């Protein structure tokens, strides 16, 4: 057996190999390698080996993964140690040798099954000797790998960067949320493969399409099982905990082990970020994408109905879906060999409720190009995703007698400002052009007409275009409001009514404000006002109204938006005019001052300031600072109360330990709000060597 060669030990050269395979952030002790790329091990012998060629002919290596390794399903491979090797299959070549050791280069196939492997040595068919374990990952640097990404800057961003930005807010007030993907945290690789192991088709782990769909489905299932309803009331400390949303790793730990940070229903958008972490960890380039004004739950229909009462307030839930203020999704990069040519590149992970098709049946993988072109027959989810960014909204008025009346509402454009973090920077990149042709363009018209025709033929669904409205006595309504409103602040809104007819009109105007969650679900009714106006013939009238937090029936729940609506009705027509604006609630600005460049192992100081722009004191203030490569562990500091118009200032000193672009994240929690964050990036350079 192995003792015939007198094997003393095997050095897997983890630090060196991990450096060459872009996995050094995972570990310097455990071996993590990427498929299709050689890695080096060193065999040490107990006694000198004089006859090299005879000894070489007697030995072979076996690499195996999974619970039941098999050569048939490509989870086990036995291959000789030679002087040539086969770069297309498992191979091993002696690169250097002496009497005491052999340096062996092992190459894995570019389409090998990923996962935890055991490497064994076999001598002359006798019992195998375990040399050690390694983990094999996808390889975006290898042209033969299905996840190959040729741009180095994109590989650095979509695979190696742990500091992310996720875009929340509204289409008119996009807010960047600092996010720690943490794909190289110590236990993330094991948690990810543990999750993947629930799929017993290990032989298909060589296919990134299969792996992505399995992970998307399992994470969606975990989210549905683990996401908790947000309590209506909670103490300040509990509220601060509920709204923590700094990164993927605590969430992944909670979902898989029950230990970590819980997620509540108002934050279920984090699924896209957790999926991005797991995909990047396994070697699949991925990014989080946000679509503003996204039509969800339409069943692929290109019409979405919204219902409002006579006061202009949203009347419960739509029968067929609703428009989300924003919706996050995960894109991953890979080839699609099973699809027609032209659908390689970015794919959208689209999990859904299980429909009897097993794990894969509850997560589709949709080429972005298929959504843009409206290729409905390519894969089932194209229809849903196309509708999400192209549907038309129809607004109905629910009358007191139970009848529904169609309103004349301005077209709500869905699928706006589709955004993701820019490559190598903190800027917001608009990628709407990847998903749809320009609004009003000939290409957009052609795609929509083709999709409408196909839907009517396939589904016999006439609900494609909004119902036409005709009125002999038109009234026009225009609503203007700021894109954001300071927390506990005030603003001016204006309503413009235009009477183009030759007759005077008696108009009833209803204006309302509601708090809504990001997914369009009503959270609270806050304020309403009714006006009775007389509008002269051929006249335009502008009504200006103050919007004050102090007039609201209650404070808007944390992490909600204001939905401002206006509905105008006149006596000569049953047709009401309707307009709506979504307003982001902005909290006080958290300012961070810090040098743009710092030296490794040299103290660095950051200054943090927060002015209380509210009308009440900020009490129970806690500042937390964190940053991988800058601060070993999160630090938290308690501060005194900050009175209105006063400013809280603090300085923090820490010592950077990692070279490269690092990010400091600062968070403030108090009785008035939780999870107020900001971030600042710093480039850490290695110390100059003294002459």
UniProtKB/Swiss-Prot annotation:
Q: Which positions bear Phosphoserine?
A: 248
Post-translational modification remark: Both cAMP-dependent kinase (CAPK) and another kinase present in the red-blood cells seem to be able to phosphorylate EPB42.
Question: Which keywords appear in this protein's UniProt record, sorted alphabetically?
Answer: Cell membrane, Cell shape, Cytoplasm, Cytoskeleton, Disease variant, Erythrocyte maturation, Hereditary hemolytic anemia, Lipoprotein, Membrane, Myristate, Phosphoprotein
Record's subcellular location? Cell membrane; Cytoplasm, Cytoskeleton
Q: Does the keyword Cell membrane apply?
A: yes
What does changing residue 287 to C do?
In SPH5; Shiga
Main localization of the protein? membrane
Transmembrane parts of this sequence: none
The function of this protein is: Component of the ankyrin-1 complex, a multiprotein complex involved in the stability and shape of the erythrocyte membrane.
**Which PANTHER family does this entry report, sorted A to Z?**
PROTEIN 4.2, PROTEIN-GLUTAMINE GAMMA-GLUTAMYLTRANSFERASE
Family (UniProt): Belongs to the transglutaminase superfamily. Transglutaminase family.
Protein name in the entry: Protein 4.2
What organism does this protein naturally occur in? Homo sapiens (Human)
